[in-house]
Amino acid sequence: MLNFLNFYSVPLAELEVGKHLYWQIGNLKLHGQVFLTSWFVIGVLVLASVAASSNVKRIPSGIQNLLEYALEFIRDLAKNQIGEKEYRPWVPFVGTLFLFIFVSNWSGALVPFKLIHLPEGELTAPTSDINTTVALALLTSLAYFYAGFSKKGLGYFGNYVQPVSFMLPFKIIEDFTKPLSLSFRLFGNILADELVVGVLVLLVPLFVPLPVMALGLFTSAIQALIFATLAAAYIGEAMEDHHGEEHEEHH
């Protein structure tokens, strides 16, 4: 019985969170496996874009049809969250976020990264690393600050005392909680999904984890949609003109 337990304790230990392939660049210590899988995801997106645009047809088919559908979906999402007048410049940013997160999430389930052995750690979805999700959340924060300042200038700070002045500390705290919630929600969901599927694959036959993997693909797509939707909503909120709305209501 002891030998049986020891047999299963070895592979389960390999699922330990925190093992990384480190790259030392000067004084910086980088997570190498995150860069490798991120470059893979970027390469997939670039190849798909080139394939879709190299031979454009009036009646789209194949990869062109798929990417045109994705573009229309992202454009509608941005229009609904940001507004019809302001959304167009932000479609590339929101679309890049959505597609990168979507492909990253799915790569962890569909690409056999586990077959590639590294000196330390293992290859997983880029979004299962907190550094990736924090970087995406900080980019979103910079984007909505830029959106607000580009439209309102210093008047953007007026949002911090709307509708009443004592909202100022709560609005400042909100600026910190937005990237925190974005990053930890995405990181937690993707990491948990990979760990659950990994444990099930070790403990039970192949076909038993398949429903869990299918559910993981669905939730991964939903997480990409949630992140992109919230990013667009924050940008729209930063550019929202409260004074303009009040003026229209009086008329």
Curated annotation (Swiss-Prot):
Membrane topology: Multi-pass membrane protein
Keyword Ion transport recorded: yes
Molecular functions (GO terms): proton-transporting ATP synthase activity, rotational mechanism
Source domain of life: Bacteria
Subcellular location as annotated: Cellular thylakoid membrane
CC annotations in GO: plasma membrane-derived thylakoid membrane; proton-transporting ATP synthase complex
Pfam family, one: ATP-synt_A
Transmembrane spans: 34-54, 93-113, 130-150, 195-215, 216-236
Subunit-structure text: F-type ATPases have 2 components, CF(1) - the catalytic core - and CF(0) - the membrane proton channel. CF(1) has five subunits: alpha(3), beta(3), gamma(1), delta(1), epsilon(1). CF(0) has four main subunits: a, b, b' and c.
Family note: Belongs to the ATPase A chain family.
Name of the protein described by the UniProt record: ATP synthase subunit a
